[in-house]
Curated annotation (Swiss-Prot):
Gene3D superfamilies: Bira Bifunctional Protein, Domain 2 (3.30.930.10). It is an enzyme of class 2 (transferase). Substrate binds at R70, G71, G72, Q73, I74, T75, Y76, H77, S138, L139, G140, G151, L152, A153. InterPro entries: aa-tRNA-synth_II/BPL/LPL (IPR045864), BPL_LPL_catalytic (IPR004143), Octanoyltransferase (IPR000544), Octanoyltransferase_CS (IPR020605). CDD domains: LipB (cd16444). The lineage of its organism: Bacteria, Pseudomonadati, Pseudomonadota, Gammaproteobacteria, Pasteurellales. This is Octanoyltransferase. The gene is lipB. Catalyzes the transfer of endogenously produced octanoic acid from octanoyl-acyl-carrier-protein onto the lipoyl domains of lipoate-dependent enzymes. Lipoyl-ACP can also act as a substrate although octanoyl-ACP is likely to be the physiological substrate. In the reaction, the free carboxyl group of octanoic acid is attached via an amide linkage to the epsilon-amino group of a specific lysine residue of lipoyl domains of lipoate-dependent enzymes. GO terms for cellular component: cytoplasm. It comes from Haemophilus influenzae (strain PittEE).
């Protein structure tokens, strides 16, 4: 197995632009293409997953709504949320299937939050990561030709109010939280968090990291 993992720090980006780049990357990759992680924050946007239902958008606003091809329901992205897109050739990993990749992503977040003294957990019936019943991380993937794209969105230090305009991930009344609710403001930093996410994800799947 090629165990190299390229990590790209992309900063603040338009959702649709990055989404289409992920599609192009996945459509054109071959057996020699190295797996990649894209770390990004997005301008404010609601994204509907393939299972998304219009009724879960409770209130219209100036925030655009984009119909995406990832799994899951509606969610919200904005600056102060660390998004980690995983462009992985699952076929390369002998003991990895889609469910196990989801578990690895959830455990990546659990281990990262544990470094801040936060006890978090996944739910078997609702992908993502939770703290005291509130959701801190959303997760949605798309698999094409055995390769993943999309990934996770971890709330760090953002305006959570637009989550009230939706039923997050299709769950009415689901409360959201973020790292800044539990730590000092200077600790709630996307760059610091992303470094921890990458380390734990690479450790879980046995990658060597190259940062670009």
């Amino acid at each position: 197995m090629n165990n190299s993992l390229i990590v790209r720090q992309l900063g603040l980006q338009d959702y649709q632009e990055i989404w289409h780049k992920m599609q192009d990357f996945t459509d054109t990759r071959n057996a020699e293409t190295q797996d990649e992680i894209w770390l990004v924050q997005h301008y404010p946007v609601f994204t509907q997953g393939q299972a998304g239902k219009p009724e879960h958008l409770l209130q219209r606003s100036e925030i655009p709504v984009v119909q995406s091809d990832r799994g899951g329901q509606i969610t919200y992205h904005a600056p102060g949320q660390q998004v980690m897109y995983v462009l992985i050739d699952i076929k390369r990993h002998k003991n990895l299937n889609v469910r196990q990749l989801v578990t690895a992503l959830e455990q990546t977040v659990v281990k990262t939050l544990a470094e801040y003294g936060i006890e978090s957990y996944p739910k078997p019936d609702a992908p993502g990561v939770y703290v005291d019943g509130k959701k801190i991380c959303s997760l949605g993937l798309r698999i094409r030709r055995g390769c993943s794209f999309h990934g996770l969105a971890l709330n760090i230090n953002m305006d959570l109010n637009p989550f009230h305009y939706i039923n997050p991930c299709g769950y009415a009344g689901l409360e959201m939280c973020q790292l800044a609710d539990f730590v000092n403001q200077d600790e709630a930093d996307c760059d610091n968090v992303s470094a921890k996410l990458i380390k734990h994800f690479a450790d879980l799947l046995g990658y060597n990291i190259t940062t670009l």
